[in-house]
A protein has these predicted regions:
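Residue-level recognition of the GNAT/N-acetyltransferase active site
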Residues: 88, 93, 132
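Short, well-ordered amphipathic alpha-helices
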Residues: 30, 106-116
């Protein structure tokens, strides 16, 4: 098996066609929408690859949370809008599942969020996640992640 490359921003050169996470909507987003949304500056998708073939990805986007809808520990004492980064998608190809790649992608996302926060690149108070289903929600809950109200 070829070496796994660290996550980098998605480009035209990445091979997407064979990606299959088992979740059709996650496959479709990567293969048909991720690059266009990135070019429009709506989100940024980072991909892990083997020989340029995408084996996992995650997508980050800036959002604002309504403080009244946010969990108390986040919304208490905050103005009406709370700046946040949304981990909108995280998916691993079926052939790579069960090997820790999902965890590695989450750690990489957290590192990038920390860099944004620590260096003041953008005002971000919190990272929230959008779990696609109960299985994903359980995955995120193991890392004390807060489901997104957006």
């Amino acid at each position: 098996m070829s070496k796994l490359a660290a996550p980098l921003p998605l480009t035209d050169g990445h091979l997407l066609e064979d990606f299959d996470s088992g979740q059709p909507s996650l496959n479709e987003f990567l293969q048909q929408h991720a690059l266009a949304k990135q070019r429009a500056m709506l989100s940024r998708t980072y991909v892990a690859t083997r020989e340029n073939r995408v084996v996992g990805y995650y997508t980050l986007a800036f959002v604002t949370l309504n403080s009244a809808e946010a969990p108390r520990r986040i919304g208490r004492g905050m103005p009406d809008s709370i700046p946040a980064l949304l981990l909108a998608r995280l998916a691993v190809d079926r052939r790579e599942q069960g090997r820790g790649l999902g965890r590695s992608l989450l750690v990489d996302a957290l590192r990038r969020v920390w860099e944004v926060m620590a260096h003041g690149h953008a005002p971000v108070r919190v990272l929230v996640v959008d779990a696609i289903d109960e299985s994903a929600a359980r995955f995120y809950s193991r890392f004390d992640m807060t489901p997104s109200p957006v």
